[in-house]
From Swiss-Prot:
Keywords: 4Fe-4S, Iron, Iron-sulfur, Isoprene biosynthesis, Metal-binding, Oxidoreductase. Its EC number is 1.17.7.3. It comes from Hyphomonas neptunium (strain ATCC 15444). Disulfide bonds: none annotated. InterPro entries: Dihydropteroate_synth-like_sf (IPR011005), IspG_bac (IPR016425), IspG_bac-typ (IPR004588), NO2/SO3_Rdtase_4Fe4S_sf (IPR045854). HAMAP family: IspG. The gene is ispG. PANTHER family: 4-HYDROXY-3-METHYLBUT-2-EN-1-YL DIPHOSPHATE SYNTHASE (PTHR30454), 4-HYDROXY-3-METHYLBUT-2-EN-1-YL DIPHOSPHATE SYNTHASE (FERREDOXIN), CHLOROPLASTIC (PTHR30454:SF0). Binds 1 [4Fe-4S] cluster. This is 4-hydroxy-3-methylbut-2-en-1-yl diphosphate synthase (flavodoxin). It holds the Pfam family GcpE. NCBIfam families: ispG_gcpE (TIGR00612), PRK00366.1 (NF001540). Belongs to the IspG family.
Length: 380
């Protein structure tokens, strides 16, 4: 739950779901909402895939999905799994044997698509491999690849068809005594996706993986995903997310975290509050923010920073952030620390000064967190 006793209108009551394990990560229940992305390198090229996974992990990815379309790709998974610092989900379509091979290779989770995985007997074999290797599974329904009998029944992809597909396959896993699974019901149609997830959330306690599939490029995909997934997250629905963009996977991770940060569901990195700028600005706000976003991208500790061009809203915004800079002086501005006006800084020195303040604060926060973790008593 995102709980704010002072501002209760910001509270989000998360849907109660059961927990499943994805490698060393717990998903569902009261676990943090996990941010996922997917590699786009040929999986057979282990070196390129590992390099991309490492970049995604550096950006903050909790889970990375890897497509396994060929026997060569599942062979490469052994090397990839060993080198990955985060749990890997093997993406399986059409060829159920790839799921068995991926489980044997060390994948933490198997994603299967009910629309193309095949018969009950094939699913049973995949489940046996998952159980034997400690894998969880994801039932990944997609509006673009629904089973033929459901399309004939409903006429087109619709919420009822997607939920029926998901629950039919959930029952197969339940009947096999396998409960370590999460479910997704994605479509490129935002309205269809949101409606399907709301219906699914009422019908199961399985963790739900959110996404608007084939959302588009960096700008359009971010907007569409933020509206659709943001509405679901605000309603308390969702245990893992993936922002599907026609962009590098690291960008998906960044957008995913910004979405969660905006809703108060996760905190990571610097949250910059900035004005759009106008004629009153005392410095170039747009260029300054662009520079700071790049210079502070390596910070993982949660820090809020306001960059406001003038004194109309600057002091008020700065009073709500850890650090803040407000323009208004002659080629200078006021630096706020912990919500209070602290000192003046020349515009020419502002970026370097802010970067140092943020890095120093991040170092203190990390040292404090490390000390707290070192003194924690292990659970019996």
């Amino acid at each position: 739950m995102s709980h704010n006793p002072i501002r209760p209108w910001r509270n989000i009551e998360r849907r109660k779901s059961r927990q499943v394990r994805v490698g060393n990560l717990m998903v569902g229940g009261d676990a943090p909402i996990a941010v996922q992305t997917m590699t786009n390198t040929p999986t057979e090229d282990a070196a390129a895939t590992i390099a991309q996974i490492l970049r995604c992990a550096e950006a903050g990815a909790d889970i990375v999905r890897v497509s396994c379309p060929t026997e060569e790709s599942t062979k490469a998974m052994r090397e990839i799994v060993k080198a990955s610092p985060v749990p890997l989900v093997a993406d399986i379509h059409f060829h159920y044997k790839r799921g068995i091979e991926a489980a044997d290779a060390g994948a933490a989770c198997l994603r299967i698509n009910p629309g193309n995985i095949g018969s009950h007997a094939r699913v049973k074999e995949v489940v046996a491999a998952a159980r034997a290797n400690g894998c969880s599974m994801r039932i990944g329904v997609n509006g673009g690849s629904l089973e033929r009998h459901l399309l004939e029944k409903y006429g087109e992809p619709c919420p009822d068809a997607m939920v029926e597909s998901a629950l039919d396959h959930a029952r197969i896993l339940d009947d096999l005594g396998f409960y370590d699974y999460k479910i997704s019901v994605k479509a490129s149609d935002m309205f269809l996706t949101v409606a399907a997830y709301h219906a699914l959330a009422e019908a199961t306690d399985a963790p739900l993986h959110l996404g608007i599939t084939e959302a588009g490029g960096l700008r359009t995909g971010t907007v569409k995903s933020s509206i659709g997934m943001g509405a679901l997250l605000w309603a308390g629905i969702g245990d893992t997310i993936r922002v599907s963009l026609s962009a590098e996977p690291e960008e998906e991770v960044k957008v995913g975290f910004e979405m969660l940060k905006s809703l108060g569901l996760r905190t990571r990195g610097v949250n910059i509050v900035a004005c759009p700028s106008c004629a009153r600005q005392g410095f170039d706000v747009i260029r300054t923010v662009e520079t700071l976003e790049k210079r502070l991208a390596h910070i993982s500790e949660p820090i809020s920073l306001s960059i406001i061009g003038c004194v109309v809203n600057g002091p008020g915004e700065a009073s709500l952030t850890d650090l803040g800079f407000t323009g208004g002086g002659k080629e200078s501005g006021k630096m706020f620390v912990n919500g209070r006006a602290d000192h003046n800084v020349a515009n020419a020195d502002m970026v370097e000064h802010i970067v140092k303040l943020v890095e120093d604060k991040a170092a203190r926060l990390k040292a404090q967190r490390d000390a707290e973790e070192a003194t924690e008593v292990p659970a019996e």
